[in-house]
Amino acid sequence: GGKIAFYTGILDQLKLSDDEAAMIMGHEMAHALREHARERLAKSQATSFGLSIASQLLGLGSLGDVAANLGTQLLTLKYSRDDETESDLVGLEIAARAGYKPEASVSLWQKMQAASGNGSPSFLSTHPSGANRIQELEANLPKVQQLYQQAAKS
């Protein structure tokens, strides 16, 4: 309950600044604050149950069960991407309020994108693409600048 795991090797591997590391911590804190793991489990169970009932009603047998499991996984990917986007933005605000430079969120994801290459197709990923994350964060930088400036004065 409430623990955050942080792979410290990423600090050296990506040569992260304190501000960039704070963005990761803010992101992970946002997951905990928004209870994403609990929500994802509940959504997954509800989706699985609904698809399983539909499969049985349609008389699809074991093939229907396989399709229901695949459907559950694909449907919950969107929830996961939404959770990641929310955590990026809430984490950005948390870090800005703590006095860390909001622009570090963009440089962090530029480094992450460069390190990971193209990766898998975005529709199969549990996370938004690096380009989408960067675009979303850049669009939200003006919203948190005042929070950062107030924290920097304190």
Identify the function of each model-found stretch.
Residues 1-154:
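A Zn2+-metalloprotease active-site environment signal
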